[in-house]
């Protein structure tokens, strides 16, 4: 999962007082989805829950879980799973471990050598630090590598490609530089690491090296470890480079990786890279980059190393060798249920427990908070509280290699989840600072309401208001500030595929949230041996007060979701978000039409030739066909229907609550809840996205060339990115039909609720 960049926020006392006034709730206003009577009782249980969360317990959970390396297939990975299972059982959950068998390669041989014009061998190892005892667990640590890199042994000239995205290769084209037959070196950042070898291979490169530049997470940002919290000169970011065609086990797409599952051969697995890849430290990168010549890299390509950044190719000539043990390994998902009075509806909560090494931040900070939530839910249950809906806590294994545990579990239980799942709430890393949340916007009003009830440990204002004010301070322009101020809700970001929410949102069509705190910690050791208890307790959430805030936030959300009379959804923010996605498509089309028209004019005028510096020659950009008209009317019309249906449901819910939420039979409420649970499934199309059929959701999906980053309405957007305008246009009516189906589902729920209110 990606980590927070450091941001700073100053909050004036006047802003604080105004914020407090704005966020005060009217006592008589019931919670979303609750009757007035149920709302008051609910808030009492929620306050008991929040009061019972103990930071010292979260600290102890982290100390235990991160004590040793616990990657997939390691002894401590299984030991942690069994310990987590024992805790859930101790707290009164009905708990079990579900085991899957997945492909998980580990390194056998790794070589990066500079052969010409000088000789150098990369260390490819993070050193033991005397001040950090955990770093000495070398026998149990995974070496520095990129999982799912194909085996390979290649020697070639080196080319620097910045972050290695498609736009970077377009820039190389302008410089007249080809990577065909070369080994590329890219710096981490600006998207999923697996995109770097993918694009390099498509451009003809035969190998890929990825390094951590100090401008991204090293001494450029602050003192490096152990004096400060930032990545040291020999620190390396491990990570998967699996392609984005589908997440999960590469050999069992679309089915759970059980013992009986039919498996692809490794040769036929589409998500394994086409060229060999290795990560290196910035110390190992300096000798390689220093021996490049050719054009000086553009300004925005230059990192924080004390060298002149050249692009190449050569004269640096590099030997890259990768060989792995391609073995099947067991993964252990811990699934724990607190049964509700209605076992037919499920609220799910998850965080992964595996790590690349010790993983105090990623993922143990989130997992430790999850366990404290579960402990306190068990305590409430002993005091007499029983949730209406069943609550399922999930400690996933195998997230780091490619969301293996959550994907295989969802694929195995897909039919049950589609029938019973109300929502899924995810966490991963948790740090110090501001509330961050993403997800499906039908839960935007809900999570905003929850966040108003949680106190920020540094300011004592609500975490909702502190995050909102921070967003205003760091808004990119006046328009963004205006947009933030015009909304009473916390604006959810759109999720791609950075963590275990992916299968729930993109494959199963389940309403989803992912929640974290961050932005104020003093450094990062992302996927390094130094991401351990010693580092975390010095430089991140020292007193675990933000671990408590995370547990309070998500635990409150879980209780509120589980107890609501009606599933607490509000579709208006979702309709607004989808309208924004559609407007972005129209803007992209208009911008491309303008860009290509202007480019063709400048080519015709000879402007590029006239502006070319003969001492630093560049190649003119290619002639592009100006995009034709695209008919967005079907989608715009469908979105109008969606807005009207969302408004209708909001009015029906308000009327139900205004009438005192008359007592009705459980069966009638359950019928409406069944309607509501079905709505997010209507975003799915069984055929999936055009080039990636595993991804079923037609609104929410990661980009094929972004990974972590979302590409809303991907069926249209990605054809536009490929300049396949006719194909993009053909997708619009199909997406419009999906949106109309969603509107129809919301209208059904609204009509049933209107009927219920009229009856009483």
Predicted regions span which residues?
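Noncatalytic luminal/extracellular "stalk/propeptide" segments of secretory-pathway proteins
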Residues: 22-44, 51, 63-183, 214, ...
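Second-shell loop/turn segments in exported
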Residues: 44-52, 66-75, 144-149, 183-190, ...
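Soluble metallo-hydrolase cores and metallopeptidase-like ectodomains found primarily
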Residues: 136-171, 247-361, 375, 379-383
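A conserved hydrophobic secondary-structure block that centers on an alpha-helix together
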Residues: 158-230, 234, 343, 356, ...
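Alpha-helical metal-binding/catalytic segments enriched in His/Glu/Asp
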Residues: 214, 334, 349-403, 408, ...
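C-terminal amphipathic alpha-helical interaction region
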Residues: 658-760
């Amino acid at each position: 999962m990606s980590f927070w960049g450091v941001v700073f926020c100053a909050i004036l006392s006047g802003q604080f007082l105004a914020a407090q006034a704005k966020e005060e709730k009217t006592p008589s206003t019931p919670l979303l989805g609750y009757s007035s009577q149920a709302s008051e009782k609910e808030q009492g249980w929620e306050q008991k829950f929040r009061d019972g969360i103990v930071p010292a317990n979260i600290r102890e959970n982290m100390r235990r879980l991160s004590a040793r390396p616990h990657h997939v297939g390691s002894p401590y990975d299984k030991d942690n799973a069994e310990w987590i299972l024992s805790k859930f059982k101790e707290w009164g959950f009905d708990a079990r471990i579900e085991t899957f068998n997945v492909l998980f390669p580990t390194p056998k041989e790794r070589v990066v050598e500079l052969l010409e014009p000088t000789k150098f061998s990369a260390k490819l190892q993070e050193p033991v630090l005397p001040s950090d005892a955990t770093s000495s667990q070398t026998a149990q640590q995974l070496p520095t590598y990129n999982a799912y890199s194909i085996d390979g042994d290649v020697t070639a000239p080196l080319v620097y490609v910045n972050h290695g995205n498609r736009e970077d290769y377009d820039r190389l084209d302008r410089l007249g530089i080809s990577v065909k037959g070369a080994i590329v070196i890219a710096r981490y950042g600006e998207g999923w690491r697996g995109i770097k070898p993918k694009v390099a291979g498509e451009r003809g490169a035969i190998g890929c090296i990825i390094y951590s530049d100090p401008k991204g997470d090293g001494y450029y940002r602050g003192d490096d470890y152990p004096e400060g919290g930032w990545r040291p000169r020999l620190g390396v970011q491990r990570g998967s480079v699996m392609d984005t065609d589908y997440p999960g086990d590469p050999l069992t797409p679309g089915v759970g990786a059980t013992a009986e599952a039919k498996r692809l051969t490794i040769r036929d697995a589409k998500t394994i890279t086409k060229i060999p890849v290795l990560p290196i430290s910035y110390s190992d990168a300096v000798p390689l980059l220093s021996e490049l010549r050719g054009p000086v890299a553009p300004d925005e390509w230059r990192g924080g190393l004390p060298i002149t950044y050249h692009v190449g190719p050569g004269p640096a000539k590099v030997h890259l060798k990768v060989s792995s043990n391609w073995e099947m390994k067991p993964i252990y998902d811990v699934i724990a249920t607190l049964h509700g009075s209605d076992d037919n509806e499920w609220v799910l909560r998850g965080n992964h427990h595996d790590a690349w090494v010790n993983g105090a931040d990623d993922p143990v900070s989130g997992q430790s908070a999850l366990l404290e939530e579960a402990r306190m839910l068990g305590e409430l249950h002993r005091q007499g509280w029983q949730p209406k809906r069943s609550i399922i806590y999930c400690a996933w294994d195998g997230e780091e290699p490619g969301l293996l545990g959550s994907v295989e579990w969802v694929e195995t239980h897909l039919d049950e989840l589609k029938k019973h799942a109300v929502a899924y709430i995810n966490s991963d890393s948790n740090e110090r600072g501001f509330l961050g949340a993403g997800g499906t916007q039908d839960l935007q009003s809900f999570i905003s309401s929850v966040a108003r009830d949680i106190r920020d440990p540094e300011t004592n204002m609500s975490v909702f208001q502190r995050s909102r004010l921070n967003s205003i301070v760091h808004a990119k322009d006046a328009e963004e500030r205006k947009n933030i101020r015009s909304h009473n809700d916390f604006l959810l970001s759109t999720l791609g595929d950075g963590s275990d929410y992916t299968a729930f949102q993109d494959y199963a069509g389940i309403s989803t949230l992912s929640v974290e705190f961050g932005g104020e910690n003093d450094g990062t050791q992302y996927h390094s041996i130094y991401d351990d208890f010693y580092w975390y307790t010095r430089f991140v959430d020292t007193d675990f007060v933000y671990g408590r805030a995370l547990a309070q936030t998500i635990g409150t959300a879980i209780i509120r979701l589980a107890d609501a009379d009606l599933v607490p959804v509000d579709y208006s923010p979702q309709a607004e978000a989808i309208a924004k996605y559609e407007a972005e498509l129209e803007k992209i089309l208009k911008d491309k039409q303008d860009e290509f028209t202007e480019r063709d004019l400048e080519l015709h005028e000879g402007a590029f030739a006239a502006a070319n510096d003969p001492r630093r020659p560049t190649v003119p950009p290619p002639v592009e066909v100006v995009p034709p008209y695209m008919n967005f009317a079907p989608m715009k019309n469908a979105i109008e229907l969606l807005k009207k249906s969302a408004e209708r449901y909001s009015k029906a819910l308000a009327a139900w609550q205004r009438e005192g939420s008359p007592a009705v039979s459980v069966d009638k409420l359950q019928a409406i809840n069944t309607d509501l649970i079905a709505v997010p499934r209507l975003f799915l199309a069984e055929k999936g996205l055009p080039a990636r059929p595993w991804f079923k959701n037609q609104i929410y999906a990661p980009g094929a060339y972004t990974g972590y980053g979302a590409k809303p309405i991907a069926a249209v957007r990605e054809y536009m990115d490929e300049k396949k305008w006719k194909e993009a246009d053909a997708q619009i009516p199909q997406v419009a039909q999906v949106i109309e189906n969603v509107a129809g589902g919301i209208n059904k729920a609204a009509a049933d609720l209107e009927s219920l209110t009229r009856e009483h």
